[in-house]
Every structure is written in C-alpha cells, then in structure tokens.
C-alpha cells in the first residue's frame, strides 16, 4: 500500500509539462483558480462582477476533453465568444481532468454563441469538442416529512436558504409510508447544491424529522406534473366581499358549507365531490383520491390527500371532503403563481 507521500509524488509526475504551463499562465494573468469538491473553478462571480448571477440557460457543457488539457488552454478559448461568469473543470485526484467542464456566461446569448462557434471545434488533431447547453439541476426533493407539517411551517424552516429558493411545494409522498415530500426549486444549480449539502450535512433532518434529500429525478417530476396538471384557481378568484361572507360561514358551519356558499355567490353552482380511499397508514391516517366538480368551471379539481380520523365512527369520505374544501378555499383566498404547474397546492395534506 502506498503512503500519502508516495501518492503525492506519483501525482506530481503525471502531466508535468501542462501543469507547469498552467502555473505559468496563472502567474502571468493573475487569474484565481480554486479547487472545490473535485472541481477547479474560476469566477462565480469573476472580478468586477456587479449584480445577480446570470439566468438559467447561460451555462454550457464541454465534453470530449483530453485529460491533460487545463484552464490555460480552455478559458481563453471560451472567452473569445462572450464574457465568462464561471468556468469549472472537473478533476481527478491525480491532477488530470475528468474529460468535461462547464462554462457559464454572463448571459444566455454568450452560451448560444459558444455552442454555435465552439461545438466540434478541433482542439487537437482528431479531438473535436462537444459543446451543448448544460442541463442545470436546480430542483431538490425532501422526502419523509410529517403529515402534520403545513406549508407555512416548511417555509419557516427553509428561511436560511433565502431568496435563492424560488418555489416550494408540499405534496403527498409517492412512497408507501404516510408522509409528505417537498419539492424545492432554486435559482441556480450552485444554490441548489449548497442547500443539498447543508441539508445532508445537517444529518438530513428538517422540521425535526429524518428526511431523504435528493436531486429531483425526471420520472418523479413527470409524475407530479401529471398529478398537478389541472385547472388554475386564478380563473375562480372571488372578490373581497365574497371572501368575507365565506370566512364568516367557515367559522360557523365548516369548510364545505363555506365553499358551497362561495360557489353560489359566484354563480358557479354547487360543488360535487368524488372520493376514493387508496389505503391506510399508522395512527389512523387514511389516503384519499378526490375530485371536485364545480358546474361553472370547465375542468374538475383532483388530487391526493391524507386525513386522520379522530374516532372509529367518523366517515373518512366526509372528513376528506371537508379537508379538500378547506384547501380550495385557501387557494382561492391566497393567489399563488407556481413554477411547477397550476393548482399545485391541491396536493397538500391536512390533519382533521
């Protein structure tokens, strides 16, 4: 088994010419390169940058790199087509690159110019670069949240991530255990990666619960899009007087009666509820599929909801209808614009 010093000596012997050229270029230009978690980075932001980071779509993926190529050959090349905000070269422990890098420009136009100009660029004989739009991961899932957690409490727990957190959804977990899953959308991949690292290094606990933190998988994203695809409540937005009367009804007779009154005031007709119990969990939790048909609206509202029954004599279907009514009323009274899909709040679980 090699000692640490022997490993260091072996790494020093790998690609010495290009390493020396890189060091000379760094001294000459004064450029600052930082090694972070298996990648070497320039910028993010670069010197003299003022303002917010570039928008999504401003980063390109660079593939088919010879492993002995370094920044002194790549950064000047990619700076020719636009101003670089950040350049990241993926590295091995030996000091060779891993065959790919990422270049983020100050605008989407710079990224488009890089693709148009440098894709298939011949860096060396028989070595053509692959340059394409980077698929930036900006979305996380936090699974295993308690059923009692509401959206406001979740947002309070996520406050440390600040304005980089653009969207938060709280939905029924697709797993078999009765729990919730949060979908978090960040402004940049870097912000999402830092949030993931913080959550994982915090022993993956959020709101006092053990949770699983992962990148949002494409199939799961599609699943939620299909589940949430539905009518937007903004087309049913009531006026202030109608909401005031509805809240009075809510306090005296319950959510379903309040929703019935609101629909009548808006001349939409009486809502019709369809529910189906999909299974049960521990501590009296029941999972329901629901659909609410409002005659004056062209498309029904549907989704999943967990409810808990206070006693054996309670009718789970009636409890589910009341819970869904409360959600529809909340969505009507608190306008939201979702980056995921219209009607996203329809999946939030409640406890009765």
UniProtKB/Swiss-Prot annotation:
Domain RRM as annotated: residue spans: 58-136, 138-218
Modified residues (Omega-N-methylarginine): 336
Gene3D superfamilies hit by this protein: 3.30.70.330
Expressed in which tissues: Isoform 1 and isoform 2 are expressed in testis. Isoform 1 is expressed continuously in post natal (PN) testis although levels are low between PN1 to PN6. Isoform 2 is expressed from PN 20 onwards. Isoform 2 is strongly expressed in meiotic and in post-meiotic germ cells of the testis with highest expression at the elongated spermatid stage (at protein level). Expressed in testis and heart. Expressed in germ cells and genital ridges. Not detected in testicular tumors.
GO cellular component assignments: cytoplasm; cytosol; focal adhesion; nucleoplasm; nucleus
Localisation: Nucleus; Cytoplasm
Disease affiliated with this protein: Defects in Dnd1 are the cause of the Ter mutation phenotype. Ter mice are characterized by primordial germ cell loss and susceptibility to spontaneous testicular germ cell tumors (TGCT). They are sterile, but viable. Isoform 1 defects may be the cause of tumor development.
Name of the featured protein: Dead end protein homolog 1
């Amino acid at each position: 088994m090699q000692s640490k010093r022997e490993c260091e000596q072996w790494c020093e012997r790998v690609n010495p010419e290009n390493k020396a050229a890189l060091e000379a270029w760094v001294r000459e230009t004064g450029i600052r390169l930082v090694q972070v978690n298996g990648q070497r980075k320039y910028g993010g932001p670069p010197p003299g940058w003022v303002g917010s980071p570039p928008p999504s779509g401003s980063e390109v993926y660079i593939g088919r790199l010879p492993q002995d190529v370094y920044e002194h050959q790549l950064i000047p090349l990619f700076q020719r087509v636009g101003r670089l905000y950040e350049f990241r070269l993926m590295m091995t422990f030996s000091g060779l690159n891993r065959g790919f890098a990422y270049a983020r420009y100050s605008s989407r136009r710079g990224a488009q110019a890089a693709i148009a100009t440098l894709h298939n660029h011949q860096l060396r004989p028989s070595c053509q670069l692959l340059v394409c739009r980077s698929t930036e991961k900006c979305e996380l899932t936090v699974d295993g949240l308690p059923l009692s957690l509401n959206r406001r409490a979740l947002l309070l727990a996520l406050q440390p991530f600040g304005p980089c957190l653009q969207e938060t959804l709280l939905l029924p977990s697709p797993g078999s255990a009765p729990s919730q899953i949060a979908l978090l959308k960040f402004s940049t991949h870097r912000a999402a990666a830092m949030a993931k690292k913080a959550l994982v290094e915090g022993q993956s606990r959020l709101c006092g619960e053990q949770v699983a933190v992962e990148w949002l998988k494409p199939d799961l994203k599609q699943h939620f899009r299909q589940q949430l695809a539905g009518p937007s409540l903004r087309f049913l937005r009531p006026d202030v007087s109608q909401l005031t009367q509805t809240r009075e009804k809510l306090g005296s007779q319950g959510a379903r009666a309040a929703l019935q009154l609101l629909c009548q005031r808006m001349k939409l007709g009486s809502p019709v509820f369809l529910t189906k119990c999909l299974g049960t969990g521990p501590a009296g939790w029941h999972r329901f599929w629901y659909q609410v048909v409002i005659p004056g609206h062209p498309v029904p509202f549907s989704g999943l909801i967990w409810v808990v029954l206070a006693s054996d004599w309670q009718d789970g279907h009636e409890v589910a209808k009341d819970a869904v009514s409360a959600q529809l009323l909340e969505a009507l009274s608190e306008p939201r614009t979702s980056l995921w899909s219209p009607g996203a709040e329809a999946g939030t679980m409640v406890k009765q």
